[in-house]
């Protein structure tokens, strides 16, 4: 028998789906990709980045630090600017909506707080526990490496970000899925999952809950602040049986990609959520049946920059929340600068592991991001991008309404880059399906929904959904791509 030279991890690690999706998009000139979540190339801030870099490199005093090694945790100035930026996002949400006091008398019960003074503690956003990473993606991997042993369990949304599922598989970790509702996580289902794991003696292997909290990839759902409170309360409730902390990892990669529209509806704190559309819109849940409210409340306007506070703003939760953000999607994906706020002992462990990986994120790119943050370039660019994506989403929505058959359901996002689409249950959309192969023959590509679901033995993996992106496609390509895909769907449904 030929000896196996690869480690167990090397054997488990397969090519990520994102790799062949990107390869297909880049290698076929006539193909219209509605798959990979590329950002809008036409909106990339070339002139702004050039001006900022010119300022960084204008003299030896400013340029030499940017071209030298830095510290593993990240440039001190950028960490301070990032901490203030994150605190500002939560303060804006708190000021608009009123703070929800979630840890009243240690009970973590969400109750409205109507004081004019937001209850947000500066130490929560301390730059001393903020780590700069090479994109927020790196923090996903580093956290799994620092926290989890082979065979441990990570709780995820159902569906979830498929690249993170690949990280779990590579490291030999198990995923257990928790259903989504139109306003975020299904807390009742989470409690049942935790109870089942406790009965089976597996709760001690649960280390983490992974939540894509804003305009979720792939569904577009936003989990509201009250649900974040309830989530943390449930995790804390089961910690005694687990015998260790159970952390919440809040992935906020899409937080600032909220849509800016004219004449925004005024609300009093409702959580934005995607609008179900189609002939039977709202009749079934995201992925699993009967979990979506059949009578969704009217969708209220999203007014920008994070109406929903992060889990960091939950009083008393600072030692249980890992928060990941990024400057890549809101500014320029090629910059690959992200950040995380972590509690101890995780912060130190992750920092040390990162040091073994790369000694620290690119100094030049960190100085670039610090310059655009401090100068206001970043904020102005994000505001333009929010309007741009709102327009492109509207173009895709109108094309879907025109070309998709009535049997297809879809959810209209209020931020992010994606539409989530569901076909009748007897029409699979996977890589080996007739829909996928016919779409490729017609030079249009989507992400099969099945790759966004964890391999959870507690339920059958849905295979009749798809994710389509308006991020990088031109308006003409969005219209033509949806037309091609609609032709395929009308033929096969």
Where does each model-flagged region fall?
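PLP-dependent enzyme catalytic core of the Aspartate aminotransferase-like
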Residues: 2, 92, 441, 457-493
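Conserved core of the PLP fold type I
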Residues: 58-98, 120-245, 249, 255-265, ...
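Conserved glycine-rich beta-strand-loop-beta hairpin in the small C-terminal domain of fold type I
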Residues: 370, 386-397, 409-423, 432
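Intrinsic disorder/low-complexity segments
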Residues: 92-124, 203, 264-306
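N-terminal small-domain helix-loop-helix segment of the aminotransferase-like
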Residues: 11-95, 121-134, 374-375, 380, ...
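Conserved core segment of the aminotransferase class I/II
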Residues: 316-387, 394
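Short, conserved charged micro-motifs
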Residues: 427-434, 476-480
């Amino acid at each position: 028998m030929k000896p196996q030279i690869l480690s167990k991890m090397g054997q488990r690690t397969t090519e990520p789906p994102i790799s062949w999706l990107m390869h297909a998009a880049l290698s076929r000139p006539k193909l219209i990709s509605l798959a990979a979540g590329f950002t809008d190339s036409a909106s990339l801030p070339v002139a702004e980045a050039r001006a900022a870099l010119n300022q960084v490199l204008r003299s030896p005093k400013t340029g030499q630090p940017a071209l030298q090694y830095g510290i593993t945790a990240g440039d001190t100035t950028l960490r301070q600017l990032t901490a203030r930026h994150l605190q500002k996002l939560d303060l804006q949400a708190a000021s608009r909506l009123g703070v929800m006091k979630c840890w009243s008398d240690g009970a973590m019960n969400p109750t409205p707080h109507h004081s004019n003074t937001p209850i947000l503690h500066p130490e929560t956003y301390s730059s001393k526990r903020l780590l700069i990473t090479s994109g927020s993606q790196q923090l996903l991997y580093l956290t799994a490496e620092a926290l989890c042993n082979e065979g441990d369990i990570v709780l995820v949304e159902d569906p979830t970000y498929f690249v993170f599922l690949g990280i779990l598989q590579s490291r030999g970790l198990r995923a257990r899925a928790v259903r989504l509702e139109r306003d975020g996580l299904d807390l009742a289902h989470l409690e049942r999952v935790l109870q089942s794991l406790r009965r089976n003696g597996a709760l001690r292997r649960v280390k983490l809950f992974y939540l894509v909290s804003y305009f979720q990839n792939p569904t577009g759902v936003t989990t509201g602040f009250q649900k974040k409170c309830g989530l943390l309360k449930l995790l804390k409730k089961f910690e005694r049986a687990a015998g260790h902390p159970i952390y919440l990892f809040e992935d906020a990669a899409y937080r600032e990609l909220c849509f800016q529209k004219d004449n925004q509806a005024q609300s009093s704190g409702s959580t934005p959520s995607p609008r179900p559309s189609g002939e039977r819109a709202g009749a079934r849940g995201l992925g699993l049946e009967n979990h979506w409210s059949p009578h969704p409340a009217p969708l209220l306007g999203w007014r920008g920059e994070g109406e929903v506070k992060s889990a960091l703003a939950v009083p008393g939760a600072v030692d249980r929340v890992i928060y990941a953000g990024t400057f890549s999607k809101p500014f320029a994906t090629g910059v690959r600068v992200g950040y995380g706020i972590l509690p101890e002992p995780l912060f130190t462990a992750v920092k040390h592991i990162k040091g073994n990986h790369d000694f620290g994120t690119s100094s030049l790119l960190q100085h670039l991001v610090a310059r655009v943050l401090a100068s206001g370039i970043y904020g102005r660019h994000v505001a333009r991008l929010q309007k741009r994506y709102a327009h492109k989403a509207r173009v895709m929505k109108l094309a879907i309404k025109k070309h998709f058959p009535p049997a297809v359901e879809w959810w209209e996002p209020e931020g992010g880059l994606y539409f989530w689409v569901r076909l009748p249950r007897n029409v699979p959309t996977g890589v080996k399906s007739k829909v996928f192969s016919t779409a490729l023959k017609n030079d249009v590509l989507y992400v099969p929904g099945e790759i966004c679901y964890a391999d959870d033995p507690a339920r059958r993996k849905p295979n009749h959904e798809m994710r389509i992106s308006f991020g990088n496609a031109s308006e003409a390509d969005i219209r033509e791509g949806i037309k091609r895909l609609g032709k395929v769907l009308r033929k096969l449904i």
